[in-house]
From Swiss-Prot:
Protein name listed in UniProt: T-cell surface antigen CD2
Bilayer-crossing regions: 204-229
Intervals, Extracellular compartment: 23-203
Segments forming domain Ig-like V-type: 23-121
Location(s), subcellular: Cell membrane
Mod. after translation: N-glycosylated.
Species this chain originates from: Mus musculus (Mouse)
Distribution of this protein across tissues and organs: Detected in thymus and spleen.
PANTHER family per record: SIGNALING LYMPHOCYTIC ACTIVATION MOLECULE, T-CELL SURFACE ANTIGEN CD2
Position of the signal peptide: 1-22
Gene: Cd2
Length: 344
């Protein structure tokens, strides 16, 4: 019974000893697009080290052996004097993985064995900060980077920390500037902003002022349009009146002026319009006696003769011609012994 107990005890001890002999894992971070050097943690090259071997996915990629040239699977790799492995090519995401390093002494014993977990990360970009005053909300965002953490500070106080590309925060005061920081194992970027927002009362007055200004502008525009329409209406009415005046003048000119009567024509018309006296009627002028019949006949013929026209008067040259004198006959009731003078 005692033997069984001792056997089980030694078995457990041996298992625990094997577990303690397991290889340690070390994480090494690389930058996307850049080379990397894999250093051996807690190791220093000494004269009793004979060999350093680097293996990736079961394949020997590089080997350092004392008194022999180093073995390199390609020119991409290089073993340094301290035993570190240098990868010269720009690292890509698919270059992430586990690299195993084994160190042997001159006696052939294993001095060290470690697994290095290589992870390739993208550097973070500079954060951006924007805010909205009506909502009192601030947003911090990062566009590029992998496996980073976003942190927001106000002054020296950490407000929030999240492993995501954007983060929002609703502030209660603006006593200190805000700082947004993005960080991952291979890079770190930050940005600081001072947020300025008008107070609510001021924004209310600004809104009221803008509204009143807009209303006043609308009224001024309406008044301007009204004045323009009124002026156009007045000009149109004035043009209509001018057209009416021009039309009346044109009709008057087309009718022509009435002919003015000359004194000679007026006298002729008056003579022509006078009705001849009835037969047997004799005109008597006060203070004169009636003329004899022969004289009346000659005088009546002279009265009927039309006066010369204005054209004939202007065409006649020289002094006017003398008219024959007519001697009046003595009245019938005069004495028989009175003799008439001889005619000229």
């Amino acid at each position: 019974m005692k033997c069984k107990f001792l056997g089980s005890f030694f078995l457990l001890f041996s298992l625990s000893g094997k577990g303690a002999d397991c290889r340690d894992n070390e994480t090494i971070w690389g930058v996307l697009g850049h080379g990397i050097t894999l250093n051996i943690p807690n190791f220093q090259m000494t004269d009793d080290i004979d060999e350093v071997r680097w293996v990736r996915r079961g394949t020997l990629v590089a080997e350092f052996k004392r008194k022999k040239p180093p073995f390199l699977i390609s020119e991409t790799y290089e073993v340094l004097a301290n035993g570190s492995l240098k990868i010269k090519k720009p690292m890509m995401r698919n270059d992430s993985g586990t690299y195993n390093v084994m160190v042997y002494g001159t006696n052939g014993m294993t001095r060290l064995e470690k697994d290095l977990d290589v992870r390739i990360l993208e550097r973070v970009s500079k954060p951006m900060i924007h805010w909205e005053c009506p909502n009192t909300t601030l947003t911090c965002a990062v566009l590029q980077g992998t496996d980073f953490e976003l942190k927001l500070y106000q002054g020296e106080t950490l407000l929030n920390s999240l492993p995501q590309k954007n983060m929002s925060y609703q502030w209660t005061n603006l006593n200190a500037p805000f700082k947004c920081e993005a960080i991952n194992p291979v890079s770190k970027e930050s940005k600081m902003e001072v947020v300025n927002c008008p107070e609510k009362g001021l924004s209310f007055y600004v809104t009221v002022g803008v509204g009143a200004g807009g209303l006043l502008l609308v009224l001024l525009v309406a008044l301007f349009i009204f004045c323009i329409c009124k002026r156009r209406k007045r000009n149109r009415r004035r043009k209509d009146e001018e057209l009416e005046i021009k039309a009346s003048r044109t009709s008057t000119v087309e009718r022509g002026p009435k002919p003015h009567s000359t004194p000679a024509a007026a006298a002729q018309n008056s003579v022509a319009l006078q009705a001849p006296p009835p037969p047997g009627h004799h005109l008597q002028t006060p203070g004169h006696r009636p003329l004899p019949p022969g004289h009346r006949t000659r005088e009546h013929q002279q009265k009927k003769r039309p006066p010369p026209s204005g054209t004939q008067i202007h065409q006649q040259k020289g002094p006017p011609l003398p008219r024959p004198r007519v001697q009046p006959k003595p009245p019938c009731g005069s004495g028989d012994g009175v003799s008439l003078p001889p005619p000229n």
